[in-house]
Amino acid sequence: MESIINLIFYIIIFLILIDFLKKNISFRKNEPPRGGVAFPIFGDLPKLGENPHRYLTNLAMKKGGIYSVWLGDEKVFILTDPEAVRDAWVKQFRNFSDHPKTKSVRIFSGNFNDMAFAEYSQWKINSKWVSSAFTKTKLKTIGDLIEKESNYFIEHLKAYSNSGQPIFPKPYISKFGINVISGMMFSQVISKDESVDKGAMEKLTVPIQAVFKRLGADNLDDFISILQPVFYFQNEKFKRQVQEIYDYLEGIYNQHDTNLDTENPKDLMDLLIISTEGKERDMIIHIGMDCLLAGSDSTSATCEWFCLFMINNPDVQKKAYQELINALKDEDNKKFIPISKKDNCPYMLSIFKEVLRLRPVGVLGIPRVALEETTIMGYTIPKGSQIFQNVYGMSHLFVSDPYKFKPERWIEYKKQKDLLKEKEMQQLQEGADVVIDNKNNIKNNNSSNKPNSKTNSIFDDLDKVSIPYSVGNRKCPGASLSELALFSLCSNILLNFELKSIDGKPIDDTEVYGLTIHTKVHPISLTLRP
């Protein structure tokens, strides 16, 4: 018996040693640098900490724009160079068009039967239906819905402001985000009088938050196959949470199917049912889940960050408020700014861009898989490798004063771009050759692999280094909708209230990590403007 135990012990030690060597020794040529010594079994997972994107960004400063880490069984390549991301996501899109098939994603997506995580072949079909439905949806109708929900939101805040009580804004912002998406998608909204703590809000927000936390976490059973049995009960709980959202949307689907008027579709779900001739029930429900979760949560998270940065930067808040006042100088209603005034508020728009640069809600995006062996910026990427885009790292390592909240940088950037276009047009008219710099950004003139080197041709090229909605064919399809919702909600908050912390001190701006990053829970003080 003792000899058997000893044999098992030595076999385990041998397997651990083999795994350690596998993770730390490579004979493949031209592979990117490794992130450091990886532990057996767990790889680099224990090093990631509470905010993996910050650890990976710090690592990029040492290892460069492309490097590899081990997340359990998976060798993962981290792209923190914007040109590397464009090479993979745009130029080599077909090879990087699929996402990893993790257990968590399989559960959420109904075996990859949605938009966000579907395989390329299914994604092409689904995206065609969704794009067609979006095209047939009137932009004015969506704008009216957003403005209506913004009005309701402001009414709730006024009640708190009049009472003198501080407010925890997160549930109200979440309600706004859910109503915009569900109103557009299903023609159903949570009543303005319904509590944010009970009823439909409770039924939706609790499982939505749980699902986002799970999908964004470094789940051990998604990366270490031998640990999957240990997480059986956790996975069963996750299935129930996903099922709660599915059941809610299934009820809505059944109502739409029963009352469908093919001549007068009233929302996106009607249009999808008509386009698919009612044959893709499960797919439509899962696309609805994608929209409800991603659309509502990302917009809500960005609004939370907007409020925090306005409180922590009162001079910016004051300047933005004055711009809103000026935009309404010829309007009768001075207490609500419509979406039509968006282009009259360039400083507000620069604030949103700066918020998304500092705190892109999807800090690591959704990973991709290399379908075939390829090269990115001269480095070999083996077949089957997972690839992460470090959105957070790019918008910090390629920007001057990266940790400073500075909306003015976007105003100046636009001026420089416009001036450059004028010069290029002038050169073309004069018949001169226009030289375009396609310099490799991983290796700078000094052969350094530091991604934040100011010799890089894209350093401070903000549109290229700040990509909160990603790039390529599988970038966020709801970016335009999100921008409209953010402008309407955030501008009207600022127009009606002065935002402050309850103690007059700056609010902790450390993020809470997940598939989208949120602020920590904190109350704020609202002062109704005259």
From Swiss-Prot:
SUPFAM superfamilies on file: Cytochrome P450
Subcellular location: Membrane
MF terms (GO), sorted A to Z: heme binding; iron ion binding; monooxygenase activity; oxidoreductase activity, acting on paired donors, with incorporation or reduction of molecular oxygen
EC primary class: oxidoreductase
EC number of the protein: 1.14.-.-
Cofactor: heme
GO cellular component, one term: membrane
Highest taxon listed in the record's lineage: Eukaryota
InterPro entries in the cross-refs: Cyt_P450 (IPR001128), Cyt_P450_E_grp-I (IPR002401), Cyt_P450_sf (IPR036396)
Sorted UniProt keywords: Heme, Iron, Membrane, Metal-binding, Monooxygenase, Oxidoreductase, Transmembrane, Transmembrane helix
Membrane topology: Single-pass membrane protein
Transmembrane segments: 1-21
Binding site for heme: 476
Family: Belongs to the cytochrome P450 family.
Full protein name: Probable cytochrome P450 519A1
Source species taxonomy: Eukaryota, Amoebozoa, Evosea, Eumycetozoa, Dictyostelia
The encoding gene: cyp519A1
